[in-house]
Amino acid sequence: MALPQISTADQAKLQLMQEMEIEMMSDLYNRMTNACHKKCIPPRYSESELGKGEMVCIDRCVAKYLDIHEKIGKKLTAMSMQDEELMKKMSS
């Protein structure tokens, strides 16, 4: 089965979307790392490795951050779909 051909314009859009996705994920990672580091690791530390409490804190922080990110993404998607439906109704 042959794959459908994509126009050059669609390829450019796809490339842009992929680049934006990478940039957004990189930004999420950086913000999450900074937030959890500030919350869980004291500014002055003497150990070269994380302590058990710090590891647990970071694990929970990352889990919460990703959970909230997912919930916000779902809510924004739902709102966007509602807006699209409203626009369709208004244009009919």
UniProtKB/Swiss-Prot annotation:
> Which InterPro entries would you find in this protein's record?
Tim10-like, Tim10-like_dom_sf
One Gene Ontology BP term is: protein insertion into mitochondrial inner membrane
* Segments carrying motif Twin CX3C motif: 36-61
The protein's predominant localisation is mitochondrion
Disulfide pairings: C36-C61, C40-C57
Give the UniProt subcellular location, in the record's own words: Mitochondrion inner membrane
Task: Give the highest taxon in the source lineage.
Answer: Eukaryota
Has UniProt tagged this entry with the keyword Ribosomal protein? Answer: no
Instruction: Write out the entry's keywords from A to Z.
Output: Chaperone, Disulfide bond, Membrane, Metal-binding, Mitochondrion, Mitochondrion inner membrane, Protein transport, Translocation, Transport, Zinc
- An MF annotation (GO) of this entry: metal ion binding
Q: How does this protein lie in the membrane?
A: Peripheral membrane protein
Of the GO CC terms on this record, one is: mitochondrial intermembrane space protein transporter complex
Q: Could you list the residue ranges that cross the membrane?
A: none
What information about domains appears in the record's comments? Answer: The twin CX3C motif contains 4 conserved Cys residues that form 2 disulfide bonds in the mitochondrial intermembrane space. However, during the transit of Tim10 from cytoplasm into mitochondrion, the Cys residues probably coordinate zinc, thereby preventing folding and allowing its transfer across mitochondrial outer membrane.
The role this protein plays is: Mitochondrial intermembrane chaperone that participates in the import and insertion of multi-pass transmembrane proteins into the mitochondrial inner membrane. May also be required for the transfer of beta-barrel precursors from the TOM complex to the sorting and assembly machinery (SAM complex) of the outer membrane. Acts as a chaperone-like protein that protects the hydrophobic precursors from aggregation and guide them through the mitochondrial intermembrane space.
Family indicated by similarity: Belongs to the small Tim family.
Subunit comment = Heterohexamer; composed of 3 copies of Tim9 and 3 copies of Tim10, named soluble 70 kDa complex. The complex associates with the Tim22 component of the TIM22 complex. Interacts with multi-pass transmembrane proteins in transit.
This chain belongs to which protein, by name?
Mitochondrial import inner membrane translocase subunit Tim10
Organism, by scientific name, is Drosophila melanogaster
Q: What is the lineage of its organism?
A: Eukaryota, Metazoa, Ecdysozoa, Arthropoda, Hexapoda
Instruction: Write the gene name.
Output: Tim10
